[in-house]
Amino acid sequence: MQIFVKTLTGKTITLEVEPSDTIENVKAKIQDKEGIPPDQQRLIFAGKQLEDGRTLSDYNIQKESTLHLVLRLRGGMQIFVKTLTGKTITLEVEPSDTIENVKAKIQDKEGIPPDQQRLIFAGKQLEDGRTLSDYNIQKESTLHLVLRLRGGMQIFVKTLTGKTITLEVEPSDTIENVKAKIQDKEGIPPDQQRFIFAGKQLEDGRTLSDYNIQKESTLHLVLRLRGGMQIFVKTLTGKTITLEVEPSDTIENVKAKIQDKEGIPPDQQRLIFAGKQLEDGRTLSDYNIQKESTLHLVLRLRGGC
């Protein structure tokens, strides 16, 4: 169908659209015709500003309807919302928008109900009734979105300085996920984090429930041990596994770490470095394996000896 888009200069643009087109699609068509970037466009119909993720039919826009195109409102700005999966969502907001408004925009774009959203900025959880300007959130600021899923719980992470960090987690979260949450809150790279609970160092590929970590449990966060280093293990499929090790770790220890991450029993693993097969009882330093060295993992097929 055809619709019309009228600009403030009085110009009328004719567009070919489908009722199922999103507002985002329409803005892209306007960009193609007129060269106006979508992030500078606001479309108004029946007195309402149209949200990118909605469709024309959602707004009952029919053939030969006229939309009004205005420039971004004064004070309008873009902010970014980053999810734990690494996806970044771009939102058009005003400094006077409440956190509740922002959650509604996220719901429009991503379908996540506001009551499952927690927004974090500068390490603080944002309260619904406050505005972006209350928190000094400015253009191109990045908020972090964490989901309050059913079964969610709080745990505490205590640092060596005595600071306690509160995290929203699921029993099914891996230690790797928890390290990503700490990075979001505190800026500490995951490869510098080691978690201790009940006297044990926690392995990245395991879950909180594997370690019987329950609501309001306290983990201890320590920096990588002196001498700690990363090495890489490359499989025949081309996958590369990153491991945290010590030079004093035995090949047996390394195989146990690979089992934790990948589920491959140690007796099916053969590790090769510099053309040599590594023996279980030897250490990494025996073989002069240093930080960021790459080992090759080959599987010992059934029937092999």
UniProtKB/Swiss-Prot annotation:
- Which Pfam families would you find in this protein's record? ubiquitin (PF00240)
The record's InterPro entries line, in alphabetical order, gives: Ubiquitin-like_dom, Ubiquitin-like_domsf, Ubiquitin_CS, Ubiquitin_dom, Ubiquitin_ubiquitin-like
- Which is one GO molecular function term here? ubiquitin protein ligase binding
Q: Give the UniProt entry's GO cellular component terms.
A: cytoplasm; mitochondrial outer membrane; nucleus
Covalent cross-link site, Glycyl lysine isopeptide (Gly-Lys) (interchain with K-? in acceptor proteins): 76
UniProt site positions, description: Essential for function: 68
- One BP annotation, GO: protein ubiquitination
Which residues get removed as pro-piece?
305
Task: Name the site position(s) for Interacts with activating enzyme.
Answer: 54, 72
Question: At what sequence positions does the UniProt record place the cross-link Glycyl lysine isopeptide (Lys-Gly) (interchain with G-Cter in ubiquitin)?
Answer: 6, 11, 27, 29, 33, 48, 63
Name the residues that span the membrane: none
Question: Is Cytoplasm given among the entry's keywords?
Answer: yes
Residue positions where ADP-ribosylglycine is found in the record: 76
Name positions with the PTM Phosphoserine. 65, 141
Further information in the entry reads: Ubiquitin is encoded by 4 different genes. Uba52 and Rps27a genes code for a single copy of ubiquitin fused to the ribosomal proteins eL40 and eS31, respectively. UBB and UBC genes code for a polyubiquitin precursor with exact head to tail repeats, the number of repeats differ between species and strains.
Describe its assembly: Interacts with SKP1-KMD2A and SKP1-KMD2B complexes.
Classification via PANTHER family: UBIQUITIN
Please state what the protein is called: Polyubiquitin-B
* Organism the protein comes from: Equus caballus (Horse)
